[in-house]
């Protein structure tokens, strides 16, 4: 197996060289301090508790049904690589009875996605799992590099997020799969909670903290087995298991708003390690009660309707992906979201999107 040495920093405070014994087995030397609870434990016990906690999450939330096909959203990064490794391991160990498939999205980011997909292909051979790759070029006739060249980098995550979600659904449908699992971890979910709160978008908290999500009328559900896994522990697991993963950050990620929330959370975590789970639980508790609709009120479009342009599920006449594509197509030569003084077609598209429910 080809092993790529991770560039993700393994914090020295988490990897400890102590003469004291593991706090769990009391037989082997402790080599690391768990970021989640600061326990000093040996590698073997870390593997056991990490894998067992994920198994308990799967079982307690009834994530899998025997006989179903499950697509693992595989990017080649640490989260999806550890997810593929663990799900194959637990499926064999606990006999979930599910058929696992790797599903990758090629956004078309030269120097990033092409290299990460090479890692996915190595993992596919190692784990002997089927692999399906769906590209933005094939689905939308655009690549992210082309989109950023026209729309600017500041809103690249908006375009990518909308297109990726739809691409995963379309890829799963192509494979006749109704369940997609992703490597979103506790840090990701806590960051999303913070982002929604900072933007004053409390209405999105319910979906952002749910371990299982599914649009009304859609046969495809998504689940997050890593909901309670700290990112640092995922890195430690990949490090000690010597898993082959791609660790370079997305070319366009530094400009994303998520990075601001991440820095804020890191500062909070340094003071209070439990803040990650605390933030998720706060998000769950802050979920707004659904308003009762007046019996005479009319709703022209709702969940379960289809986009008039592409046929994809949409709560509006035109789905979000098609709205973005229309803006790109109409403003291919001049669109620039970054230019605040020139309210062009792309900016109007973004303002319209902000009024829609994601």
Curated annotation (Swiss-Prot):
Keyword Transferase: yes
One cellular component (GO) term of this entry: cytosolic tRNA wobble base thiouridylase complex
Keywords from the UniProt entry: Cytoplasm, RNA-binding, Transferase, tRNA processing, tRNA-binding
InterPro entries: CTU1-like_ATP-bd, CTU1_C, Ncs6/Tuc1/Ctu1, Rossmann-like_a/b/a_fold, TilS/TtcA_N, tRNA_thiolation_TtcA_Ctu1, UPF0021_CS
Record-linked Pfam families: ATP_bind_3, zn-ribbon_14
NCBIfam families noted in UniProt: TIGR00269 family protein
Name of the protein described by the UniProt record: Cytoplasmic tRNA 2-thiolation protein 1
Organism listed in the record: Candida glabrata (strain ATCC 2001 / BCRC 20586 / JCM 3761 / NBRC 0622 / NRRL Y-65 / CBS 138)
Gene symbol of the encoding locus: NCS6
């Amino acid at each position: 197996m080809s092993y790529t040495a991770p560039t993700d920093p393994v914090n020295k405070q988490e990897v400890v060289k102590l003469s004291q014994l593991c706090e769990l087995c009391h037989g082997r030397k402790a080599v690391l301090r768990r970021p989640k609870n600061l326990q000093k434990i040996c590698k073997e016990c870390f593997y056991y508790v990490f894998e067992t906690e994920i198994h308990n999450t799967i079982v307690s939330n009834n994530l899998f049904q025997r006989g179903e096909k499950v697509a693992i959203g595989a990017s080649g990064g640490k989260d999806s690589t550890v997810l593929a490794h663990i799900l194959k391991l637990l499926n064999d160990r606990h006999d979930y009875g599910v058929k696992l498939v790797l599903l990758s999205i090629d956004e078309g980011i030269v120097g990033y996605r092409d290299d990460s997909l090479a890692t996915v292909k190595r993992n596919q051979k190692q784990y002997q799992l089927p692999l399906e790759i769906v590209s933005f070029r094939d689905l939308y006739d655009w690549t992210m590099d082309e989109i950023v060249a026209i729309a600017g980098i500041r809103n690249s995550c908006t375009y990518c997020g909308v297109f990726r979600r739809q691409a995963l659904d379309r890829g799963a449908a192509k494979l006749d799969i109704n369940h997609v699992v992703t490597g979103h971890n506790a840090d990701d979910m806590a960051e999303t909670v913070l982002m929604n709160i900072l933007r004053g978008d409390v209405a999105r908290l319910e979906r952002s903290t749910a371990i299982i999500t599914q649009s009304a009328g859609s046969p495809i559900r998504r689940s997050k087995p890593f909901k309670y896994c700290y990112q640092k522990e995922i890195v430690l697991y990949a490090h000690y298991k010597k898993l082959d993963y791609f660790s370079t950050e997305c070319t366009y990620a530094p400009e994303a708003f998520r990075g601001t929330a991440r820095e804020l959370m890191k500062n909070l975590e340094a003071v209070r390690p439990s803040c990650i789970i605390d933030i998720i639980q706060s998000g769950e508790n802050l979920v707004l009660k659904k308003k009762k609709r007046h019996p005479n009120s009319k709703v022209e479009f709702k969940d379960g309707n289809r986009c008039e342009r592409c046929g994809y599920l949409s709560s509006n006449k035109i789905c979000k992906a098609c709205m973005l594509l229309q803006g790109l197509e109409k403003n291919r030569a001049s669109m620039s979201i970054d230019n605040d003084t020139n309210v062009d077609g792309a900016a109007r598209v973004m303002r319209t999107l902000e009024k829609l429910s994601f």
